[in-house]
Amino acid sequence: MQRKQHPLVSPATGTQRHVVSWHYGQPDSTGPHVYLQASLHADELPGMLVLQHLKTQLDAAEAAGRLTGRVTVVPVANPIGLDQTLMYAQLGRFELGSGKNFNRHYPNLAA
């Protein structure tokens, strides 16, 4: 398993944000490649929980040599939305600055 951090544009000096992906199987595998992500709408937590659980199963499968392809897991596809709260309520569906839906508006956030 390989963990990768993909940097995002920083909202303020001295801060950092990343999307984290977990990669299972051999990178040069010619077998199937499955990509799984959760929480593009960051307030949708069940998918995050499922992928966290799946990661432990993939760890075991990889250690036992049972993976014939590759699997990429991104449990939190929207760390910006996950960090947005207002009066103790998580508001991960819409960007607070513009009010735009994260699943309809895709700003370039790559650093």
Ranges and model annotations:
Residues 1-111:
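Structured catalytic-domain cores with a bias toward divalent-metal coordination
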